[in-house]
């Protein structure tokens, strides 16, 4: 159980919370189901930081339901369904992500570009061009969209 406690300690460090808050603020976005907006987050965290940390440590913190939003796709009449967490839940998710990423990022494939820090579509294209220049002639393009649609969303 020691490693789990150590990870929780890292996640709940005030420096990590501050960085998570800054990232959520940079990302902007609308509020979740509770209506709290990003610009209301700092005063809330200043006032409730200790109780929030205690709730998480004691296993009593419960994330709020997400606010459902439909974003139109390029195809007419089709929509992408999103769940928008509350801004407080986004901070907590960001705290976890920051620490988990430090642990696992080095283990991911160098040829994986989706949803990775400091990587994106342009990096993937540069890698493709390098592969072509190195003599590779085949490309496999795959997407797991159908699998993702089947995942339960709560």
Model-found features: residue ranges?
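Non-catalytic, polymerase-adjacent accessory regions of viral genome-replication enzymes
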Residues: 1-46
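Amphipathic, well-packed alpha-helical segments that form the structural scaffold of globular domains
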Residues: 21-22, 97-101, 105, 129-133
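Conserved catalytic palm subdomain of right-hand nucleotidyl-transferase polymerases, strongest
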Residues: 30-37, 122-154
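Hydrophobic face of alpha-helices
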Residues: 34, 49, 92-93, 97, ...
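Amphipathic alpha-helical blocks
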Residues: 40-65
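Conserved, non-catalytic sequence blocks in retroelement Pol enzymes and Pol-derived host proteins
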Residues: 61, 84-87, 115-119, 147-149
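Alpha-helical transmembrane segments and immediately membrane-proximal extracytoplasmic
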Residues: 71-72
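Conserved pre-motif C helix in the palm subdomain of viral-like polymerases
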Residues: 79-108
């Amino acid at each position: 159980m020691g490693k789990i406690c150590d990870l929780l300690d890292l996640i709940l460090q005030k420096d990590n919370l501050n960085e998570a808050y800054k990232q959520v603020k940079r990302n902007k976005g609308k509020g979740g189901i509770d209506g709290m907006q990003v610009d209301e987050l700092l005063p809330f965290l200043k006032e409730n930081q200790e109780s929030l940390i205690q709730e998480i440590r004691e296993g009593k913190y419960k994330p709020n339901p997400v606010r459902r939003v439909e974003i139109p796709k390029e195809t007419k009449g089709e929509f992408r369904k999103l769940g928008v967490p509350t801004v407080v839940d986004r901070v907590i998710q960001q705290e976890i992500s920051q620490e988990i990423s430090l642990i696992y990022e080095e283990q991911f494939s160098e040829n994986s570009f989706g949803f990775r820090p400091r990587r994106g579509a342009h990096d993937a294209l540069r890698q493709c061009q390098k592969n072509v220049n190195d003599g590779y002639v085949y490309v496999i393009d795959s997407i797991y969209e159908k699998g993702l649609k089947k995942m339960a969303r709560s």
